[in-house]
């Protein structure tokens, strides 16, 4: 994928989103003066403990505490059974094919450039189709959580 396209997409998303950084007052004032610019190669990826192979790179805020922006990388062939999140989440697909739906039969595929906005507590399945890993920009309006839901009968 063209890195310029990737960085333009992320930069545009960040420009439209207020930065939520956990920094001191003096540093916060300074951060308002300088843009946040990072290349894809400079991202600091960390493994998501609950989902082996899934990684994230925080851009702003803290997903363990409240509002945040981050990049996510999910291995191709990953399936997440029924679950929900406590806060609203927006995803912008960069590469791969992300799928989501109220259940597996109704799940839709979303390729590069797609925007998927999830309301808080929406019960759904999600994952990354086999063939290539999924990379997407994610913005959460509150703390990130993953609440498994018992399968519907």
Question: What does each of the following model-derived ranges do?
Answer:
Residues 1-8:
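Bacterial N-terminal signal peptides that target proteins for export
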Residues 10-17:
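Hydrophobic h-region of N-terminal signal peptides that target proteins for export
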Residues 21-68, 151-153:
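A short, N-terminal "cap"/entry segment at the start of jelly-roll beta-barrel domains
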Residues 62-64, 104-121:
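Short acidic-glycine-tyrosine-enriched beta hairpin
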Residues 68-84, 119-121:
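Conserved short histidine dyad/triad with adjacent acidic residue
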Residues 75-77, 85-103:
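Glycine- and acidic-residue-biased ligand/ion/polar-headgroup-sensing regions
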Residues 80-82, 100-101, 123-130:
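Short beta-strand His + acidic residue motifs that chelate non-heme Fe in jelly-roll/DSBH
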Residues 120-144:
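Ligand-binding loop in jelly-roll beta-barrel domains
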